[in-house]
Amino acid sequence: MLEKVETFDMNRVIDEFDEMTRNAHQVQKQTLKEILLKNQSAIYLQNCGLNGNATDPEEAFKSMVPLVTDVELEPYIKRMVDGDTSPILTGHPVPAISLSSGTSQGRPKFIPFTDELMENTLQLFRTAFAFRNRDFPIDDNGKALQFIFSSKQYISTGGVPVGTATTNVYRNPNFKAGMKSITSPSCSPDEVIFSPDVHQALYCHLLSGILFRDQVQYVFAVFAHGLVHAFRTFEQVWEEIVTDIKDGVLSNRITVPSVRTAMSKLLTPNPELAETIRTKCMSLSNWYGLIPALFPNAKYVYGIMTGSMEPYVPKLRHYAGDLPLVSHDYGSSEGWIAANVTPRLSPEEATFAVIPNLGYFEFLPVSETGEGEEKPVGLTQVKIGEEYEVVITNYAGLYRYRLGDVVKVIGFYNNTPQLKFICRRNLILSINIDKNTERDLQLSVESAAKRLSEEKIEVIDFSSYIDVSTDPGHYAIFWEISGETNEDVLQDCCNCLDRAFIDAGYVSSRKCKTIGALELRVVAKGTFRKIQEHFLGLGSSAGQFKMPRCVKPSNAKVLQILCENVVSSYFSTAF
């Protein structure tokens, strides 16, 4: 998504955003009014008692339409997937259905995808780019190294196209037209982006980037995991890539005919470039600064680096060297929410300003005790320093939909809140009175990984599970690590993991033995890649994949993969 600066009025886009955010309250009321007008014939809204005649549509909406999750909407969306063209959630048939990654619950969710969501995507890309390009100007004639993988759509039994959200965006006929004035070419041919084989596509993305190395302005993947995975793969295949460049002949590993044809057109024998890449790679110390070494004119590295992606940031920073890491914007399969308008902030500090016309937003206060539930507040009513669950209403038939994301209000951009992603609300480790979030798990792993780093070893990936097969139940943490070390070190890591969970309920439960000793389970190399392959087989896009941090019992296949690949385990002696 590299944009051509000469045809893009950066200042106008920023001015429009400033105007909209100054009037955030009015924009929210108008957005809800338009959503309800557009979908007034929807059966769901009529069942709630909305008939379009309310004198105050906003108050009527909030009093008559309940807060829901995907569970309540699933029967309605299933009818749409099955081909029911009546106005179920929207006033008109939806052109496609999106699949979520499915990593949280072990199964993908179906989510309506409409032309309005496509327009929202284009608006957010324009807004975010304006602020990004103001801080990190790019060359008009540059290219982007984008690790994009657009999986296939399939047609449901009811005749509706179904694909991941990213696939629905990239395959939408309006995408290229809408991005034309703000897009410079990707290094990779379309045949690579739409390849049915993600492994071959990744190899070709890397090769394409190096062929155009001097033109690359930034490096992008939707998620930080995708960037780290790409350059870990490069460590393994770089010599093969160098040979391809030297001889001008594509590796035999590329067997998809369309991909092979497209890539072969880019390749001619280039011994000089091959030797340059070989020299660069051989001169690096443990691959530090790999990205700027390969792409000397790159301005930054770009992708989602918050939330469940935060554990990958240290490794990504290692590859990026001195290049800035810029956090991608805030959204989900259900729709976009906010843009990064402060791109110079590090991923750890990144905040996102809500774009008031992307949907109607409410925020459900998160109770520290978890007892009772307060009423949601509006976009401009949130308070700095408080945490909320995001509730979204959009044009695609989601009404007062609890997103499950917990965010913290860091400040305001004019009158729209700037949010920091905290965690997924339902990803909580809990056995007794303990409550540990995804963020708590990340902090625990980061703390224990410091002991491992003393041995020049790193945590490649991790997940967790509540093991209640023992009495009392206990936390099981799965680690895949980059090398071998002695048992004493791993025992230290296990104890450190246990001590790092500082939730009062957990500590007291451990001390009185109502929660058992934490277990560290080390798995074989490649285990987490097997998990990714599992989700790709379910229809997830490689670019959309997120590793499940807390494996639920319903996620039986993932748990099976983890347990079958355990090579050693350790029980904490910290308490």
Swiss-Prot record:
ATP binds at S98, M118, T121, G163, N168, G331, S332, S333, E334, G335, W336, K557. InterPro entries: GH3 (IPR004993), GH3_C (IPR055378), GH3_M (IPR055377). It is found in: Cytoplasm. Disruption phenotype: Long hypocotyl phenotype under continuous far red (cFR) light. Suppression of COP1 disruption. Decreased sensitivity to jasmonic acid (JA) and methyl-jasmonate (MeJA) inhibition of root elongation, but increased sensitivity to abscisic acid during seed germination. Reduced induced systemic resistance (ISR) mediated by P.fluorescens (CHAOr and WCS417r) and P.putida LSW17S in roots toward H.parasitica and P.syringae pv. tomato in leaves. Increased susceptibility to the fungi P.irregulare, U.vignae and U.appendiculatus. Enhanced sensitivity to ozone O(3). Induction: Rapidly induced by auxin. Accumulates locally in response to wounding. It comes from the Eukaryota. Residues 10-30 form a coiled coil. Activated by GSTU20/FIP1. It catalyses: a jasmonate + an L-alpha-amino acid + ATP = a jasmonyl-L-amino acid + AMP + diphosphate + H(+); (+)-7-isojasmonate + L-isoleucine + ATP = L-isoleucine-(+)-7-isojasmonate + AMP + diphosphate + H(+). GO terms for biological process: cellular response to auxin stimulus; induced systemic resistance, jasmonic acid mediated signaling pathway; protein adenylylation; regulation of response to red or far red light; response to mycotoxin; response to UV-B. An L-alpha-amino acid binds at T166, T167, N168, V169, Y170, K530, I531, Q532, E533, H534. One of its GO terms (cellular component) is cytoplasm. Jasmonate binds at S101, H328, D329, Y330, G331. Keywords: ATP-binding, Coiled coil, Cytoplasm, Immunity, Innate immunity, Jasmonic acid signaling pathway, Ligase, Nucleotide-binding, Plant defense. Changing S101F: In jar1-1; insensitivity to jasmonate, Strongly reduced adenylation activity. Catalyzes the synthesis of jasmonates-amino acid conjugates by adenylation; can use Ile and, in vitro at least, Val, Leu and Phe as conjugating amino acids on jasmonic acid (JA) and 9,10-dihydro-JA substrates, and to a lower extent, on 3-oxo-2-(2Z-pentenyl)-cyclopentane-1-butyric acid (OPC-4) and 12-hydroxy-JA (12-OH-JA). Can synthesize adenosine 5-tetraphosphate in vitro. Belongs to the IAA-amido conjugating enzyme family. Interacts with GSTU20/FIP1 under continuous far red (cFR) light; this binding increases its activity and determines the priority of substrate binding. This is Jasmonoyl--L-amino acid synthetase JAR1. It comes from Arabidopsis thaliana.
